[in-house]
A protein has these predicted regions:
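Post-HExxH zinc-binding segment in Zn-dependent metallohydrolases
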Residues: 84-103
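Alpha-helical phosphate/pyrophosphate-handling elements in metalloenzyme active cores
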Residues: 27-56
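Metal-dependent nucleotide-binding catalytic modules
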Residues: 24-27, 32, 68-69, 91, ...
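His-Asp-centered metal-binding catalytic motifs of divalent-metal-dependent phosphohydrolases/nucleases
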Residues: 55-72, 115
Length: 162
């Protein structure tokens, strides 16, 4: 029996948010926890920008924590409905603030790149047969363009050559 002084009454919501499941609307892609996603986005950030500022790593590790409250709505749905996307962005920002998470710059192109690249890499790792679908063909083209813009094209080549 666990002594009463060791009972956990409440787990921090930042930690709990790591249990949110991604890819639930794509049954052909295995489930991924938000903690796994955040950790991999941080790994990608450090691979491409090894001397980045702490705020970018902080953003990588917390950018989707608000999904604990609003859920993980797939990007294509948000792309199809800008009004929904704006409402979800606001609700996620409020949820992150209530969790005590500092304001995150979701418009930082490095975070956008790392987030998309993590999704692409996860699908490549777990469901590579899907990479020929138009959405993933567009994604890798977009990532190539972003890598050029961010001056990390050689790092992108290095990523795939290991």
């Amino acid at each position: 029996m666990i002594p009463p002084e060791h009972h956990v009454v409440e787990i921090n919501p930042i930690y709990r948010s790591g249990s949110v499941t991604r890819w639930h609307t794509y049954p052909e892609v295995p489930a991924q926890s938000l903690a796994d996603h955040h950790g991999r986005v941080a790994q990608i950030v450090l691979f491409f920008w090894p001397n980045c500022e702490a705020s970018l790593l902080y953003a990588a590790l917390h950018h989707d924590c608000g999904e604990l409250i609003v859920g993980d709505v797939p990007k294509p749905r948000k792309d199809d409905d800008p009004e929904l996307a704006a409402l979800l962005d606001l609700r996620e920002a409020v949820a992150r603030a209530e969790m005590g998470i500092d304001v995150i710059d979701h418009n930082d192109p490095r975070l956008i790149f790392a987030d998309l690249f993590e999704a692409y890499s996860y699908v490549a790792l777990t469901s590579h047969h899907l990479l020929g679908e138009p959405a993933w063909v567009r994604a890798i083209a977009t990532l190539g363009e972003m890598a050029d813009m961010l001056d990390v094209s050689q790092r992108l080549v290095d990523w795939f050559s290991r």
